[in-house]
């Protein structure tokens, strides 16, 4: 009798577990992570200097970076994560008159991109199904004295998508 009760209890637990809907448990907010911004400044009369830019967050949640000079180059690595979900897109907006911004070393993630829908030069990446993480470097160079926002937005198939992150850069 104990064996029959054990078998029935085990079958009931298996049936209960099989009827659960596990797919809806993976609803995570997609994340954007950035390495510390590195500034490279090189002028005709000086040696190239490399340093890490400091930053603080303002009341609106923008990362406000230290002031740099027109012509300095800032590089950082962008990491996108959808955790238990899949990436669907990434978009960067910036003032093209004030900044020259480019994605670098894209060969490493080209296999994950839907090239028909992506426009790398315009800051739009569209991901193929099945990818939940992407890492790539970006670089920007201020073209004129201005305070400029660089807004990054990552989308995933999560109901908590998208996520936005803004960097504010002042150049003199």
Tell me what each language-model feature is.
Residues 14-44:
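Bacterial Sec-dependent N-terminal signal peptides
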Residues 74, 146-152:
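Exposed beta-strand face motif in extracellular beta-rich ectodomains
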Residues 161-172:
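C-terminal edge beta-strand
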């Amino acid at each position: 009798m104990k064996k029959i009760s054990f078998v029935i209890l085990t079958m009931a637990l298996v049936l209960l577990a099989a009827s659960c809907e596990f797919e809806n448990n993976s609803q995570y907010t997609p994340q954007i992570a950035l390495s510390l911004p590195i500034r490279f400044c090189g002028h005709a009369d000086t040696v190239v200097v490399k340093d890490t830019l400091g930053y603080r967050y303002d009341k609106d949640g923008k990362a406000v970076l230290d002031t740099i000079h027109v012509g300095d180059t800032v590089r950082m690595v962008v990491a996108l994560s959808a955790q238990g979900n899949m990436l669907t897109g990434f978009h960067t907006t910036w003032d093209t008159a004030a900044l020259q911004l480019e994605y670098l070393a894209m060969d490493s993630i080209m296999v994950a991109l839907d090239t028909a829908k992506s426009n790398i030069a315009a800051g739009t990446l569209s991901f193929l199904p099945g990818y939940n993480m992407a890492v790539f470097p970006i670089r920007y160079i201020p073209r004129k004295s201005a305070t400029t926002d660089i807004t990054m937005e990552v989308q995933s198939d999560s109901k908590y998508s998208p996520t936005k992150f803004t960097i504010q850069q002042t150049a003199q």
